[in-house]
C-alpha cells in the first residue's frame, strides 16, 4: 500500500477557453469534470500573463512568476546586450519552438525554485519546464519529441493526448505528491481548425475522460480524499482569418530585419520575435550599446513605419518604455501612459483611451490593479505591461494584433486559424476548476496557483513570487 500523502494533479489543458468549457459542462459533454470537480468544488476563471503563450505562460504555474520576472519574455526573444557583445554567442536569441527548446530550463533564473524542487515525488507530462524533476520522473522526456513531430506532420493530436493520459495514469504507480500534465490537443486543433471545431471539442471531451479515469483510480487506491485536482489553461485563443507578417512589414519598408527561422543576417537593423502569433517584439539593432530604447528613441529608430503600423486594421496596440517606470500604450484609438511608483501603478490616457479603463490616477497595488481591470477587455493590463518591460530581454516595441488577425505568415506551416499571445481578455482569461471550496474569491492570477499548491500541500510558500495563495 502506498503511503498516504497529499497529492496535487494539475491538468494544463493548453488553449482551453472558459466559455467553451462552460458550454460543454452545460450540455453534459464533460460529465466527469462536472460530477467530480465542479459539483463538489469550484468553477471560476483566472488571468494569465503577457505574452499569453505556451512556454512562458507555464512559468506562473511552475515558478509562480510572470515571463518578465523569469527573464523569458516570449516563446521567441532576442537579448540586445548579448547580441551586440558577442557575434556568435549562443544566448543572443532564442526560439523554443524548435531545436532550442531544451535550453528553456537553462534560461531560467537559477535563484528561483521550480515547483518540482519543492516536492519529494513530482512527475511531469509534456511540459518543457522540467528543472528539479528526479531522474525518471519526466515521463515524456524520451517520447515527447517523437509524438509532437508525428502530430505536426499528420495534424493528428488526439494520439498525443492519449499518450499523455497513459503517462498520467502511470505516474500513480510512483506514489506521487505532485503531477503536472499538459494536454495539447485543444490548443493544437484550435490553431489548425477553429476554437469550436468538432476536433477541438473532442479534445475537451478526452480531458473529461482522463479525469474520470484518474478519479476512479485514486478512489480505488484510497487517495481521492487527499487529492487536489486543478483544471486550468495557460491561455485562451481566438479565431484568425488574416495575417500581417510583422517582420515582412518592416523588411518591405527598408529595414533589414532578422526573424526566425532566418536568423543569420549581416548587419540587421531590426529583429522581430513573435509569440503565439498575436504578440510580437521589435528590437531596434541600429545602435551599438545594446541598451533598450526609451520614449522618442523608438519613433526615431522606426520612423514613419511606427505610425503606419499603428494605423493598420490588424494592429490592436503597441507599447514601449516611456521612461524609468513608465510605459506608453499607443493605438489608433488613443494613447495612454502606465506609471509605476513606490505606491503602485496608475493609468493615464493622454488621448482617447486605448485600454478602455478610464483614468486610474490613484496608485494601485498589484492586487487592486487586477481587481480594477479583471472584467475589462485587458485584464491585469497594468501589471502585465510593467512585468514585461522590466525584463532586459523584452523588445523596444511590443505589438499586439486585433482579434481575427495575427503577426506571422512567412514560414508558418501549417497555417494558423487561431492565435493567442496578446493582452486581450479572450487570450488572457482561462478556466480555473478545482475540487475544493472556500478559497479566496478575489480575482485570481494563474501565478497564484504556485503558492496555493504549496500551501494546500502543507509546504512553505516561496517569497518574492508574482502570486499569492488562494487557500
Language-model-detected regions and their locations in the chain:
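Active-site neighborhoods of enzymes that stabilize oxyanions during catalysis
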Residues: 267-440, 446, 450
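Short secondary-structure boundary/capping segments
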Residues: 24-28, 139-141, 194-198, 243-250, ...
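A structural signal for short, well-ordered beta-strand segments and their strand-loop junctions
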Residues: 12, 45, 121-127, 178-182, ...
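Short, solvent-exposed loop/turn segments at the edges of secondary structure
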Residues: 53-56, 224, 241-245, 250, ...
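His/Asp/Glu-rich, glycine-adjacent segments
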Residues: 58-198, 203-206, 328-375, 394, ...
Amino acid at each position: 500500500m502506498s503511503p498516504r500523502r497529499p497529492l496535487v494533479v494539475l491538468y494544463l489543458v493548453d488553449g482551453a477557453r472558459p466559455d467553451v468549457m462552460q458550454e460543454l459542462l452545460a450540455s453534459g459533454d464533460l460529465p466527469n469534470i462536472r460530477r467530480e470537480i465542479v459539483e463538489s468544488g469550484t468553477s471560476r476563471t483566472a488571468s494569465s500573463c503577457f505574452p499569453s503563450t505556451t512556454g512562458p505562460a507555464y512559468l506562473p504555474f511552475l515558478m509562480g512568476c510572470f515571463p518578465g520576472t523569469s527573464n523569458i519574455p516570449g516563446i521567441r526573444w532576442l537579448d540586445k546586450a548579448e547580441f551586440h557583445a558577442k557575434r556568435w554567442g549562443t544566448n543572443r536569441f532564442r526560439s523554443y519552438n524548435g531545436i532550442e527548446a531544451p535550453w528553456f530550463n537553462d534560461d531560467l533564473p537559477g535563484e528561483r525554485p521550480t515547483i518540482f524542487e519543492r516536492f519529494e515525488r513530482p512527475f511531469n507530462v509534456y511540459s518543457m519546464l522540467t528543472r528539479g524533476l528526479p531522474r525518471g520522473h519526466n515521463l515524456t522526456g524520451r517520447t515527447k519529441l517523437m509524438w509532437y513531430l508525428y502530430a505536426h506532420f499528420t495534424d493528428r493530436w488526439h494520439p498525443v493526448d492519449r499518450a499523455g493520459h497513459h503517462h498520467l495514469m502511470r505516474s500513480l504507480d510512483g506514489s506521487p505528491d505532485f503531477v503536472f500534465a499538459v494536454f495539447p490537443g485543444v490548443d493544437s486543433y484550435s490553431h489548425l481548425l477553429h476554437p469550436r471545431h468538432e476536433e477541438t471539442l473532442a479534445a475537451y471531451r478526452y480531458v473529461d475522460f482522463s479525469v474520470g479515469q484518474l478519479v476512479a483510480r485514486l478512489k480505488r487506491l484510497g487517495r481521492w480524499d487527499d487529492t487536489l485536482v486543478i483544471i486550468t489553461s495557460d491561455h485562451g485563443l481566438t479565431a484568425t482569418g488574416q495575417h500581417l507578417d510583422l517582420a515582412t512589414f518592416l523588411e518591405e519598408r527598408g529595414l533589414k530585419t532578422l526573424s526566425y527561422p532566418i536568423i543569420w543576417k549581416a548587419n540587421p537593423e531590426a529583429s522581430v520575435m513573435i509569440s503565439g502569433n498575436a504578440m510580437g517584439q521589435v528590437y531596434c539593432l541600429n545602435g551599438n550599446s545594446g541598451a533598450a530604447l526609451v520614449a522618442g528613441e523608438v519613433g526615431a529608430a522606426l520612423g514613419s513605419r511606427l505610425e503606419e503600423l499603428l494605423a493598420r486594421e490588424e494592429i490592436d496596440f503597441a507599447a514601449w518604455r516611456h521612461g524609468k517606470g513608465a510605459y506608453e500604450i499607443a493605438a489608433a484609438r488613443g494613447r495612454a501612459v502606465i506609471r509605476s511608483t513606490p505606491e503602485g501603478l496608475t493609468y493615464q490616457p493622454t488621448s482617447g483611451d486605448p485600454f478602455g479603463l478610464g483614468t486610474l490616477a490613484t496608485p494601485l497595488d498589484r492586487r487592486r490593479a487586477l481587481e480594477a481591470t479583471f472584467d475589462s477587455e485587458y485584464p491585469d493590463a497594468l501589471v502585465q505591461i510593467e512585468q514585461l518591460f522590466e525584463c532586459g530581454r523584452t523588445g523596444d516595441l511590443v505589438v499586439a494584433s486585433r482579434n481575427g488577425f495575427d503577426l506571422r505568415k512567412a514560414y508558418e506551416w501549417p497555417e494558423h486559424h487561431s492565435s493567442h499571445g496578446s493582452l486581450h481578455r479572450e487570450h488572457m482569461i482561462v478556466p480555473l476548476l478545482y475540487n475544493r471550496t472556500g478559497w479566496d474569491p478575489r480575482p485570481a492570477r494563474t501565478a497564484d496557483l504556485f503558492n496555493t499548491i504549496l500551501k494546500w500541500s502543507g509546504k512553505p510558500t516561496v517569497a518574492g513570487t508574482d502570486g499569492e495563495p488562494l487557500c
